[in-house]
Every structure is written in structure tokens, then in C-alpha cells.
Amino acid sequence: MSNLKITNVKTILTAPGGIDLAVVKIETNEPGLYGLGCATFTQRIFAVKSAIDEYMAPFLVGKDPTRIEDIWQSGVVSGYWRNGPIMNNALSGVDMALWDIKGKLAGMPVYDLLGGKCRDGIPLYCHTDGGDEVEVEDNIRARMEEGYQYVRCQMGMYGGAGTDDLKLIATQLARAKNIQPKRSPRSKTPGIYFDPDAYAKSVPRLFDHLRNKLGFGIEFIHDVHERVTPVTAINLAKTLEQYQLFYLEDPVAPENIDWLKMLRQQSSTPISMGELFVNVNEWKPLIDNRLIDYIRCHVSTIGGITPAKKLAVYSELNGVRTAWHGPGDISPVGVCANMHLDLSSPNFGIQEYTPMNDALRDVFPGCPEIDHGYAYLNDKPGLGIDIDEAKAAKYPCEGGIPSWTMARTPDGTASRP
């Protein structure tokens, strides 16, 4: 039995990029040996901190940090009810930190513990958006000049983490020149208003313009963000076939995944799903029945590296590739965890990447190097990233609910964000 023990577990909250982040730090009885893990659930950041500090920390202190699988399994069932996003993120922070410790003990990067490199660099896709087709085209050209070969293209709707403005939908809708939403009632409930029908009609126009101007040498991704009806999603996937997307992301909501069978029967557009998944019963039938081409779970929301590696292997056996979620509301520690999985998985597909500002890179030394559309990790033991707690404390979290989640359709009905 190892004499190594967990002596302390702390949750570090910080927002150097303007988005609330949570990082777990696990300390041991070996001086200087600690691990970091991402537990970021931005929309419920203080609930995750409470789960870690009040439940996970007492559960962990005194345990052997090298027993990663046992800690993960016992941690999952310790609350009896399981597979919710708050406890999964808490468990993820612990799990990643334990892998970080294990790598440091072995003197190896985590990707070596997971089987070693399958590739020399990690191809990335970045976000592009705009108020009309020409603006989107211009932004894509700028990313192409930076070396990106894969881009996500959005117009006049949710722009994702590719913009510095946190009021994402409001900003995009205000700039949308070619989307005419339906009128709203006289008295509007506060929220971010979005017309899913007008949006769906605009998407084929966008990709028709982009292919005519940019050709087929650049890979395009589009995120529906689950905000249309299943029938509309099917029609959209069929219409977009001619534009040969790399994939269409989240065409339906998790509550409507049974519709993917009908979509698959009617369209050859590649499909990516998983951003909102929290447990195996959501992704397993999609992989078993070959209803998706890419699995893109948010690694911290499914519980960390341990379940993500198993999911990657299971996907490999069924011809499905990985495309882990990589938005702005993931800490650089989580970004590195994604990339260690990317390097060690033969069925890796693509990695979403959100640029990091100087403050993020200052608080988190050891961030990946980005060069001409590829990411490169350092070869340091563990996850290869650290946190400067004094600098992190300069960027306190606000804990508010992001405005983009307050979505409504033109008549005022609450909508999926």
C-alpha cells in the first residue's frame, strides 16, 4: 500500500477571461506534490464549489491519490443519486487532479499514461461569426491566414465562445442583417429573443455564399445548438448536404435524441452530439446505432478523464470519432485535459478551441502553444499546467446567470439556449 495520502482539497474560483472558472487543487503529504483539475460549471459555479468543499474534500482526505479508478467509482455513488452536472463537475476536478498527480509521480505526461501519442499536433477548429454572409466570409479568411483549416460558421445567432462579448446571442442578433424575425407581442418578457424558423432559413444561404467564395478546401462546422424543432433539424441537415460540412453540431436536444434515427435515414450530413450529455445512457445508444459521427461531450460534465477515456475507446470500437467540447467556459486545465485525450486517442476527430487572453495565460502558466491551427502541449509530467493562486485571486467570480441562457422565441416562450 502506498504511503502517499491526500492532505487537502481546495476549490479555486477565478475569472481572468471574464468567465467564471473552477479549478480543484489536491495536495498530498509529499512536499510540493499536488494536482489540478477543472470543475467548471459556469452557470452554477458556487454550487460546484460547495459540493467540492463540503462533500468531496472530507471524502478524499486521507485517501491514496494513486487509486484513481476506485476514487472515481466510490465518488460517483457516494451521494446515492448520481450523474448530475454539479456533482459530475466536482468529481471531474478531483479526477483530473489525480491524473495530474499520477503523471508527476511517474515523471510522464498524462497522454503517456493513456497510451502515448497517436499524433504530433492537435488540429483545431475556431469560431467565426458575423452579421451577414460577407462578414462571416471576411472573418473566415482572417482565420485561414492564421493557419486554421477548420472553422465553425455562425450568422446572426448564438456565436459561441469565438466572440469576446459575453452577451453572445444579443450581440449576434443585433448585427444580423439578413435574418428577419417574427414580431413579438406588445409586452415582452425580459430575455434574449430568437426566431428559430428565420434562423433555419438563413443557414443554407450562408453556406451557399461561403462555398461559392471560398471553395471546398476549408472545412466548415455549424452549431444548431439544439434550438430548432426535430423536423426543422432534419430538413436543415438534408439541405446542407450539398455544402459538405465537416459536421452539423447538436441538431436536436438531448430530450429529442430519438429523432436522430430519422435524421440519419434522410441525410448524409455528418452529425456531432454530446455537449449536454451527463451519463452513459445518453451517448451509448447513439454510438451503438451509429447515429452520430462525432462525440463531443464536455469532459468535466461527464466526470473527468477517467470516463472520457472509456468513452473514447468505446467510440473507437464503433467508428465514432471524438470532438471534445472546448468553449470559453472551460479552464485552461480542462483545455489541457482535452488535449491529453486528443493526443492519445486514435479515433480523435477535431478539437474545438477558444483563444485565451493574456490574463488567462498569466494565471495558468503552461497553456498549450497554438501555431497555424494546431495545438502543442509541453512534455512536462502530469497535465503540464499550473495556476498562480495570487494572480487568480485578482479575478473574482461573479456567479451570475449568463444572459445568453435566457432565450425566448418571438412570442415570448422560453427556449433552449
From Swiss-Prot:
Active-site residues from the entry: Y158, H225
Alphabetized InterPro entries for the sequence: DgoD-like, Enolase-like_C_sf, Enolase-like_N, Enolase_C-like, Mandel_Rmase/mucon_lact_enz_CS, Mandelate_racemase_C, Mandelate_racemase_N_dom
Entry's cofactor comment: Binds 1 Mg(2+) ion per subunit.
Keyword vocabulary terms for this entry: Lyase, Magnesium, Metal-binding
GO MF terms held by the record: gluconate dehydratase activity; magnesium ion binding
Keyword Metal-binding among UniProt keywords: yes
Binding, Mg(2+): D223, E249, E275
Site, Important for activity and substrate specificity: residue positions: P327
GO biological process, one term: carbohydrate catabolic process
Cofactor (UniProt): Mg(2+)
EC assignment: 4.2.1.-, 4.2.1.39
Reaction it catalyzes: D-gluconate = 2-dehydro-3-deoxy-D-gluconate + H2O
Top EC class, one word: lyase
Binding site for substrate: Q43, H127, E275, R296, H325, D329, E352
Function: Has low D-gluconate dehydratase activity (in vitro), suggesting that it has no significant role in D-gluconate degradation in vivo. Has no detectable activity with a panel of 70 other acid sugars (in vitro).
PANTHER family named in the record: D-GALACTONATE DEHYDRATASE-RELATED, STARVATION-SENSING PROTEIN RSPA
Family that this chain belongs to: Belongs to the mandelate racemase/muconate lactonizing enzyme family. GalD subfamily.
Stated name of the protein: D-galactonate dehydratase family member SeV_A0456
